[in-house]
Every structure is written in structure tokens, then in C-alpha cells.
Amino acid sequence: MRRLRRLVHLVLLCPFSKGLQGRLPGLRVKYVLLVWLGIFVGSWMVYVHYSSYSELCRGHVCQVVICDQYRKGIISGSVCQDLCELQKVEWRTCLSSAPGQQVYSGLWQDKEVTIKCGIEEALNSKAWPDAAPRRELVLFDKPTRGTSIKEFREMTLSFLKANLGDLPSLPALVDQILLMADFNKDSRVSLAEAKSVWALLQRNEFLLLLSLQEKEHASRLLGYCGDLYLTEGIPHGSWHGAVLLPALRPLLPSVLHRALQQWFGPAWPWRAKIAIGLLEFVEELFHGSYGTFYMCETTLANVGYTATYDFKMADLQQVAPEATVRRFLQGRHCEQSSDCIYGRDCRAPCDRLMRQCKGDLIQPNLAKVCELLRDYLLPGAPAGLYEELGKQLRTCTTLSGLASQIEAHHSLVLSHLKTLLWREISNTNYS
């Protein structure tokens, strides 16, 4: 014990020779303070890591809840047997950024997948933080027993009209949903199958995946069980999901986000190819088969890409249908335009006379994406391209006015940007 005390004394209190201590008495105190500060910060980081992990990463809770409902016959789905009976769905890295939306990387049928599951009800009570929760069956309460397939079809169509708008393409989407619900191909939709699909439709991202399933830049849906679903593996580029602790992500300044993206991101020509894919995704969101969609959180966190540097939207949670945004904003009480915001950056004007928000957005998707691309593309851009690219991006970011009234200008600016980038990387290995 005496030897241990002497060792601690030597490390903490005697870092310098006695002669040096005599000449610089203040250094010893500073050294001790620095060491203890390091110990404190390290302890805090360990505490944050484990507390945030236990709060944000509750895949085991999600699996217990889903499999409990499956064994009771309340829900079903194409991955239920593999998830709950055969244990063939492997949960790997936790990527969750909010307790209510569990996101994990995983492996299923020898494919890299992303596992997503909502457990809002399960997290409401703190009485059993580590035990399997008794989830109330609020999510799986519709449709009720006795509902006919015709009634379920009408119910689904009404839901889609409310969220996507009254579009002529919706009946075809309803047919696809019913086909997906009949995962065992027995030509009938059971109550458990209907409950599962209805619960999935309440998930914003799942509805977006269905609406954008034919688009190149959205992840493909692979299977589901209840309201848990699997998509293609998380694309490259979502580096902060693995590098940063989930609790620290919101604390990181946007400037540091951008710097890290440039340091750890791909070479400039690959970034140009990814940017072209992002611009194509903006086109896909504008007047598609199922209406217009708005990007309501435009950040580098969502700029994902495949192994061949083709753009993939990393997260569709903050992409919203026009009808949903309008319903939320129109008629909402406001004193100024800052009161009329959906998500993070979908803003509408405030009618100060009526003190109500209007339904049309001020800034289109393209203007927000171009703001993002200024930080993503200009650093490291070729000298001969830098000035023209900067000019095009500045023009793009100034797009304003009602999003529904700028279609022609929107398309022209977008086309010019894509052409400029393609010209730079065409006839090279990067194309």
C-alpha cells in the first residue's frame, strides 16, 4: 500500500525534478489540475456513453415487444419467423438518435440491412427500464375484428388521401399495399396482416418508402414484422452514426460537421457524383407519381452513398408529403414567420393580418440543397470550375417565392447545375 501511495505521489505531485520545481513552483499545481481535469472529463465521457446507450439503444426491448405480439397472433409479417423463432435477424450496431425510433444495422439472409422499430409506448413508463414492457395495443388496434377487405381498402385509401393528397394514382398504391400485406401469398389478408400494415403506414418513413419505392435514390424495403421493418443496409457517408456517441450528435456545431465531412469524406470528383444524385433526388420529390414531397431537415447527415458513390437518402424521416405539411401549417396561429415551421426548415409565410400561417412554403427543396452543396462541393473544387460553380450555387440558393410557382425556373437551375458537374467528371474514372 505504501508503494502504491508513493507511486501516485510521484505521478501526480512530482512530475518535475526538485530543482525545476523550485524554479517553477506554479507548474506542479497546474500539472495536478490538468491531470484531475482529464480524469473528470474521461469519467464524464464514460458516463455519457453508457447512460445514452442504455436510453437510446433498446433493440432488445423492441424485439421482445414485437415477438410477444407475434406469438399472440396479433401481428404478422415476412420477417416474423426469422426474427422471433429462428433468430436469423442479427442486430449489430446501434444507430438510434431518438429513444422512440430504434435504428440498428444488421444482417438478414446474408444481406446487410437496417432494422427500424418504434417503441414510443414502451418508453413512456420508467417503472421497468430493463424489463420487457407491457405495451398497450394502441398501435395494433386497427382494423378491428369483422372488418371486410373492402372496408380495409377504403380505410387505407382515405388514409393515403389525407397524407398524400387526392391523387389518381392512389388506388394503384392501395393494391400494392394489400399485395404486400399478403406476404404468405394465400390470396387473403388476415386480421394480423392488416393490423401490421396499418401500423406500418403510421410510420412516416415507411409511407415515404412506399411512395418512393420506384425511385433510384431511396432505400429499398426488404421485409417487416408488425411495425418493425428492414431496409437496405445504411449507406456510406452516415459516418457520425458510428463515430459519435448518439447523445453528442446534437451538440456538435454545424461547422464541425462540415469540417469532419470534408476530412473523412470522399475525394472531390466522387462528391460531385454524389451531388448529382442528390439533385436527381430533388427532381424525384417534385411532382412524382404520388405528389410533391418536401425535405424538412436538409443536413449532411442525410447525404449517404453506395460503394460506387451513387447517392442514397440516408434517412427519410424528415421528408414529408406536401399534403401533410399543408395540413399542419395552414390556419396555424402565428405572430411572425418563425412560428410557421414544419420540421426543422420547412417554412411558410405568416399572414400577420389574419395571424395565420399560409400553406405554401417559402423556400423550395432545391434552394436548401444548394446551400448544403456550397459547403459540400466548393472546398477542394478544381480551380477552373470553382468560380462558375460558386456562381451557379449562389443563384440556386436565392430561389424563393412560393414553391408551387417556380417550377420552370427550378427545373432550369437544376439542369444547369447537373450539366456543369457532369461535364467536369465525364470521360473520367469517376463517371
Curated annotation (Swiss-Prot):
Motif May mediate ER retention in this chain: 5-6
Similarity annotation: Belongs to the DIPK family.
UniProt xrefs under Pfam families: PIP49_C (PF12260), PIP49_N (PF14875)
Disulphide-bridged cysteine pairs: 57-94, 62-117
Major localization listed first in the record, in broad terms: endoplasmic reticulum
Sequence intervals crossing the membrane: 31-51
Native source organism of the sequence: Mus musculus
Cytoplasmic side: 1-30
Keywords: Disulfide bond, Endoplasmic reticulum, Membrane, Signal-anchor, Transmembrane, Transmembrane helix
Reported modifications of this chain: Among the many cysteines in the lumenal domain, most are probably involved in disulfide bonds.
Name by which UniProt lists this protein: Divergent protein kinase domain 1B
Annotated tissue distribution: Expressed in kidney, testis, lung, heart, stomach, intestine, pancreas, liver and salivary gland. Strongly expressed in acute pancreatitis, brain, and in peripheral endothelial cells.
Subcellular location: Endoplasmic reticulum membrane
Topology Lumenal: residue spans: 52-431
UniProt membrane topology term: Single-pass type II membrane protein
InterPro entries assigned: FAM69_kinase_dom, FAM69_N
A Gene Ontology cellular-component term: endoplasmic reticulum membrane
